[in-house]
Every structure is written in structure tokens, then in C-alpha cells.
Curated annotation (Swiss-Prot):
Cited InterPro entries: NA-bd_OB-fold, Ribosomal_uS12, Ribosomal_uS12_bac
GO biological process, any: translation
Single GO cellular component term: small ribosomal subunit
Matching Gene3D superfamilies: Nucleic acid-binding proteins (2.40.50.140)
A Pfam family per the record: Ribosom_S12_S23
Record's protein name: Small ribosomal subunit protein uS12c
Keyword annotations from UniProtKB, A to Z: Plastid, Ribonucleoprotein, Ribosomal protein, RNA-binding, rRNA-binding
Family in the record: Belongs to the universal ribosomal protein uS12 family.
Annotated function: With S4 and S5 plays an important role in translational accuracy. Located at the interface of the 30S and 50S subunits.
MF term (GO), any: rRNA binding
Localization, UniProt: Plastid
Quaternary state and interactors: Part of the 30S ribosomal subunit.
PANTHER family: 30S RIBOSOMAL PROTEIN S12 FAMILY MEMBER (PTHR11652)
Length: 124
């Protein structure tokens, strides 16, 4: 244990935490262009065809981003907005595409959690 005088002289070393979304570079979102839209299969206990897109960000980095919701209109050269947030059963997918922004349409006929999928509230 250091003495008070040693702490005055040197101080304590700050622990550096590793970021979970390095491509965002401390931004809440980043814009990117879709390079390829495809499906991948999840890890062991789960079985599905999850929709993902390979995206080139404005910072020239290439990432894999998950496309949430049912159905999408993302094609090559679509402009996308990316946020952080991993998909637990897809290794290497640490980003998600924000629906209802730029060239990406919202999920059609979505009633619950509609704000997360870029859909307007249905008036009864």
C-alpha cells in the first residue's frame, strides 16, 4: 500500500476499460453504406436465418450489423444509420441498424414497440 507522499508524487493509475463498440468511436450513431445484405445462422442451441448487412462507415471501417424486425428493404448502396448493441447468438455482430431512418423503412404493421422499429403509432 502506497504512502500518502507516494500518492501525491505519482498518483494512481486509471484502469482502461475496453469499448464494446470500437467502430462508433464514442459516437451514439454512425452513418454507413451497405456493401452486402445476407443471412447467417446463429450459435449452437438456436436455429434461424438472421438478416445482417456488411456496412462501410463514414470512418472507412467495415462492420457487420444486424437488421432487426420482420422484412427489410436494404440493398447494396443503401445509406444506413448504425447504433451499438450486440446480438447474443451471432458471433462478431456488435452493431444494429436503426429502422425508419435514411434509406431503411420501418417494420410494416408493427403495433407493439413500434418506436424501436421506425413505425408510426396506429390511431384507433
Amino acid at each position: 500500500m502506497p504512502t500518502l507522499q507516494q500518492l501525491v508524487r505519482k498518483g494512481r493509475i486509471q484502469k482502461h476499460t475496453k469499448t464494446k463498440t470500437p467502430a462508433l468511436n464514442n459516437s451514439p450513431q454512425k452513418r454507413g453504406i451497405c456493401i452486402r445484405s445476407y443471412t447467417i445462422t446463429p450459435k449452437k442451441p438456436n436455429s434461424a436465418l438472421r438478416k445482417v448487412a456488411r456496412v462501410r462507415l463514414t470512418s472507412k471501417l467495415e462492420i457487420t450489423a444486424y437488421i432487426p424486425g420482420i422484412g427489410h428493404n436494404i440493398q447494396e448502396h443503401s445509406v444506413l444509420l448504425i447504433r451499438g448493441g450486440r446480438v447474443k447468438d451471432l458471433p462478431g455482430v456488435r452493431y444494429q441498424i436503426i429502422r425508419g431512418t435514411r434509406d431503411v423503412s420501418g417494420v410494416t404493421a408493427r403495433r407493439q414497440s413500434h418506436s424501436k422499429y421506425g413505425t408510426k403509432k396506429v390511431k384507433n
